[in-house]
């Protein structure tokens, strides 16, 4: 193989977009879409990619399959708990599926106008944060991505 051919083979293909290695699944109720969008923007500022079902599952796609696929791809779950979402079946499904994937999964419950005692049982053992502490989480996430924080 010529030198030129070897160089060309090493270059990433334009047809194959690169996906950041660190992906965060953001679970939320549809009524909290605006807040979830802001959380995704902050997460993406670290270099991570995000999944949000209302944005990333297309019309006609199978919703549970799409969620399961993204849960497998994601390293962390940020679940926005609000008065509208805390008892919603989809939020419970996402948290349960992520927790079931591996017991030591990093699940961050972000509380927005709800109390700590409203956190679903399956993720109560995980440290939750207030929406007002989200920037601190983003700093920790950036450290994990750079490999400087656990």
Q: Where are these predicted regions, by residue range?
A:
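Short, surface-exposed helix-loop/turn micro-motifs enriched in polar/charged residues
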Residues: 55, 59, 87-90, 108, ...
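Alpha-helix boundary/capping detector
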Residues: 69, 96-97, 124-125
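Glycine-rich, charge-decorated loop segments at or immediately adjacent to ligand/cofactor-binding or catalytic sites
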Residues: 115-126
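Short acidic-hydrophobic, aromatic-tinged amphipathic segments that line or gate anion-handling sites
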Residues: 128-133
């Amino acid at each position: 193989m010529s030198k030129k051919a070897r160089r060309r083979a090493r270059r990433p293909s334009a047809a194959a977009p690169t996906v950041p290695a660190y992906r965060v699944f953001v679970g939320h109720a549809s009524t909290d879409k605006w807040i979830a969008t802001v959380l995704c923007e902050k997460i993406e500022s670290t270099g991570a990619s995000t999944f949000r079902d209302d944005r990333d599952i297309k019309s006609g796609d199978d919703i549970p399959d799409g969620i399961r696929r993204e849960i497998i791809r994601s390293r962390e779950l940020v679940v926005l708990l609000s008065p509208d979402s805390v008892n919603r079946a989809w939020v419970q499904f996402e948290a349960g599926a992520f927790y079931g994937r591996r017991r030591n999964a990093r699940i961050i419950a972000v509380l927005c106008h709800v109390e700590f005692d409203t956190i679903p049982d399956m993720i109560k053992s995980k440290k939750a944060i207030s929406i007002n502490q989200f920037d601190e989480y983003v700093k920790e996430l950036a450290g994990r991505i750079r490999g400087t924080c656990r």
